[in-house]
Amino acid sequence: MCSSDLAASKYTLRLLARRIQNLTAEIEDLQREIHRVVTAHRPQLLEGYGLGPDTAATLLITAGDNPDRLRSEASFASLCGVCPVEASSGNTSRRRLSRGGDRRANAAIYRIALSRLRWDQRTQSYLQRRIAEGKTKREALRCLKRYIARELYPLLLGQPNTGPERLPEAA
């Protein structure tokens, strides 16, 4: 490699390193700001298991400026796309995944579910119980997402947490 090529490579790497540092600092600033805004609007939302500032902000954006327009937890679940859709035919009675709703909110609830599945023993036993009932893992995860939406609804309205301790018997 020629010395001018080496110098150009070093210069380019230094520029890229500075850019990475600047972007990392910008990301940290934005994360602090998101945390501040979420804490100012719905601090109890951050108390939910598996919820971070990014996920909470996504759910707040989905609920909008007037979360009271969501008349029930079912309307919130439908808005997030975690409400199952009837897909029965003849003697077969079943429900399928809803492809409607806010996909970002659906993805946020999915991330909450994955976080809980990894770290929360109650959620793991809930999923195993649903699978033992004859549901596929995918269907059990869909049930879990619906329960999470049910649990998040009062938090979005600013009501006290109904408690994740209800998970095994309520869901």
Q: Which residues does each PLM region occupy?
A:
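A detector of single, family-specific signature residues
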Residues: M1-A171
